């Protein structure tokens, strides 16, 4: 037995030297590949990844859930690899506020992802990697144009603003269509009608135009928003495995075609506006941008001058900002109402008490309807249907929570984790609008600000204010007049389908009943 341990394999000096050289080379490559860390900083922790694949298999079909689980193990700042690309993942409200707000200039970039380059030919304000002064100035220009034809007052209308006027009209048309469906079929899929109503609101603001609910041109585009969301969602393999772009890929071909169709639609609308444009007679957002484009003065704003092509890009960005999130929010809201009928009754009791039936709800009623507001906040939190912000990237070498983050690092911001953080919410899986109400029945402002859906900081959604108002007014008008339900025993699938905005499975068993109770009206 002992003789076995005395056996040795002779190694020559040259073999020993070769082995030592190879070992040193491998060690040098590993150290060279790792970033040099400034003194006192660490690299973010994270799970081991497979060669070539990285951690893509860990993400699965629900990356927001997988990364939330990883944050429990590695903390609010962790790093994964998708393919060979390192990705920083941020969780936790304080950490995300630190990055996007207090260190906003460091984290305001966008990664140069392949899917982003397909959106408006890579010239989108929302998806473009550009984050410099020209981008910031054009973003302000787009935001101001949208504000001028949404929350600004319309002197020719009795409504408080353009948005209230458009939503009030579309909500009435929507109610009529739903009741027609009830009379003809006895049930309906609400998403089919909500999507056109919301699209008409943003079309009115951008183009002074609305479409019929059966208009095939509009329907062919807005009903494909799911596919767009899947194409630009965080962790899309196409962005991290370049070889997939050169293999037969029907989904990629469809995504390219969808972007071309959206662009052609917007291009046609802008061209029509040029034909009828009159300086001094600004009708809508597109006219406002055309006016700016034709202003050739060489002043301090010359660097943000919009070309005709850029107008199409900006309008397309605004259409997206004012359409998909609102449609998804209202659709999820109706799902929660039919699965929580007592919540629906409480909202309607509040509407009856505050407004009655003598007039439509207005935006000015919002502060007097705290339970309605609490319901919307809880829908945003519980559904958390924008699980990640659009990916960010760092614009320079920086640090966060003691970790070194190099310039150009792709960053995923996990909004779903914040909205389901047990430390913040106690019972995050429960749908409970009352959590947002104080003892005196008003909105708990501090808690409401912890619901994150529209991003934070310099890349925050430019349509957030409009979206919140639009969701409120649509729901208030609908619930004042009708009650939503599904037949007893109908199973409603609440499982979210992952994408930039997470949709639910379509439900074709919705019903509405015109309300007769609570018809006594307080003074207007």
Curated annotation (Swiss-Prot):
EC number(s) given by UniProt: 1.14.14.1, 4.2.1.152
Compartment annotation: Endoplasmic reticulum membrane; Mitochondrion inner membrane; Microsome membrane; Cytoplasm
Induction conditions: By polychlorinated biphenyl (PCB) in liver and kidney.
Catalytic reactions on record: an organic molecule + reduced [NADPH--hemoprotein reductase] + O2 = an alcohol + oxidized [NADPH--hemoprotein reductase] + H2O + H(+); estrone + reduced [NADPH--hemoprotein reductase] + O2 = 2-hydroxyestrone + oxidized [NADPH--hemoprotein reductase] + H2O + H(+); estrone + reduced [NADPH--hemoprotein reductase] + O2 = 4-hydroxyestrone + oxidized [NADPH--hemoprotein reductase] + H2O + H(+); estrone + reduced [NADPH--hemoprotein reductase] + O2 = 6alpha-hydroxyestrone + oxidized [NADPH--hemoprotein reductase] + H2O + H(+)
Record keywords: Cytoplasm, Endoplasmic reticulum, Glycoprotein, Heme, Iron, Lipid biosynthesis, Lipid metabolism, Lyase, Membrane, Metal-binding, Microsome, Mitochondrion, Mitochondrion inner membrane, Monooxygenase, Oxidoreductase, Steroid biosynthesis
UniProt GO molecular function: estrogen 16-alpha-hydroxylase activity; estrogen 2-hydroxylase activity; heme binding; Hsp70 protein binding; Hsp90 protein binding; hydroperoxy icosatetraenoate dehydratase activity; iron ion binding; monooxygenase activity
Residues the entry annotates as binding substrate: 228
Region spans: Mitochondrial targeting signal: 33-44
Record pathway: Steroid hormone biosynthesis; Lipid metabolism; fatty acid metabolism; Cofactor metabolism; retinol metabolism
SUPFAM superfamilies: Cytochrome P450
One of the GO biological process terms: steroid biosynthetic process
Binding site for heme: 461
Gene3D superfamilies, per database record: Cytochrome P450 (1.10.630.10)
PROSITE patterns: CYTOCHROME_P450
Entry GO CC: endoplasmic reticulum membrane; intracellular membrane-bounded organelle; mitochondrial inner membrane
Glycosylation sites: 71
Family indicated by similarity: Belongs to the cytochrome P450 family.
Complex formation: Interacts with cytosolic chaperones HSP70 and HSP90; this interaction is required for initial targeting to mitochondria. Interacts (via mitochondrial targeting signal) with TOMM40 (via N-terminus); this interaction is required for translocation across the mitochondrial outer membrane.
Name recorded for this polypeptide: Cytochrome P450 1A1
Species for this entry: Canis lupus familiaris
């Amino acid at each position: 037995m002992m003789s076995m341990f005395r056996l040795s394999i002779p190694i020559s000096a040259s073999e020993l030297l070769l082995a030592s050289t190879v070992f040193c080379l491998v060690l040098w490559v590993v150290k060279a590949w790792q970033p040099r860390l400034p003194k006192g900083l660490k690299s973010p922790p994270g799970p081991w990844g497979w060669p070539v694949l990285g951690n893509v298999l860990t993400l699965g079909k629900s990356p927001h859930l997988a990364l939330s689980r990883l944050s429990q193990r590695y903390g609010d700042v962790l790093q994964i690899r998708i393919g060979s690309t390192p990705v920083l993942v941020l969780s936790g409200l304080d950490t995300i506020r630190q990055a996007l707000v207090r260190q906003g200039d460091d984290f305001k970039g966008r990664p140069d992802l392949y899917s982003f380059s397909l959106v408006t030919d890579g010239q989108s304000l929302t998806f473009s990697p550009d984050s410099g002064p020209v981008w910031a100035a054009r973003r302000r220009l787009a935001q101001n144009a949208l504000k001028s034809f949404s929350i600004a007052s319309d002197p020719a209308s009795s409504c408080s603003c353009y948005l209230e006027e458009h939503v009030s009209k579309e909500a009435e048309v929507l109610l009529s269509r739903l009741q027609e469906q009830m009379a003809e079929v006895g049930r309906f899929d609400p998403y089919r009608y909500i999507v056109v109503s919301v699209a008409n609101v943003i079309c009115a603001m951008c183009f002074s135009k609305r479409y019929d609910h059966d208009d095939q041109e509009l329907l062919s585009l807005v009903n494909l928003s799911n596919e767009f969301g899947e194409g630009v969602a965080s962790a899309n393999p196409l962005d991290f495995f370049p070889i997939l772009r050169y293999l037969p890929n029907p989904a990629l071909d469809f995504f390219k075609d969808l972007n071309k169709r959206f662009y052609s639609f917007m291009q046609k609308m802008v061209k029509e506006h040029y034909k009828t444009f009159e300086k001094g007679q600004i009708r809508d957002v597109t006219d406002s941008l055309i006016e700016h484009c034709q202003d050739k003065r060489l002043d301090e704003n010359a660097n943000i001058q919009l070309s005709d092509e850029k107008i199409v890009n900006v309008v397309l960005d605004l259409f997206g900002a004012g359409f998909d999130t609102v449609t998804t929010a209202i659709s999820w809201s109706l799902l929660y109402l039919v699965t929580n009928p007592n919540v629906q009754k409480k909202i309607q009791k509040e509407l009856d008490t505050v407004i009655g039936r003598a007039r439509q709800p207005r935006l000015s009623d919002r502060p007097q309807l705290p339970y309605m507001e609490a319901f919307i906040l809880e829908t945003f939190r519980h559904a958390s249907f924008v699980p990640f912000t659009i990916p960010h990237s760092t614009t320079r070498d920086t640090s966060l929570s003691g970790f070194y983050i190099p310039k150009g690092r792709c960053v995923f911001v996990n909004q779903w984790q914040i909205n389901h953080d047990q430390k913040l919410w106690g019972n995050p899986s429960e749908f409970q609008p009352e959590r947002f109400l104080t003892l005196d029945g008003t909105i708990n402002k501090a808690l409401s600000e912890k619901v994150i859906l529209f991003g934070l900081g310099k890349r925050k959604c430019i349509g957030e204010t409009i979206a919140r108002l639009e969701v409120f007014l649509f729901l208030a008008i609908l619930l004042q007049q009708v009650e939503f339900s599904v037949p007893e025993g109908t199973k409603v699938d609440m499982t979210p389908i992952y994408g930039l905005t997470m949709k639910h499975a379509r439900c074709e068993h919705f019903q509405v009943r015109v309300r007769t109770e609570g018809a006594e009206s307080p003074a207007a």
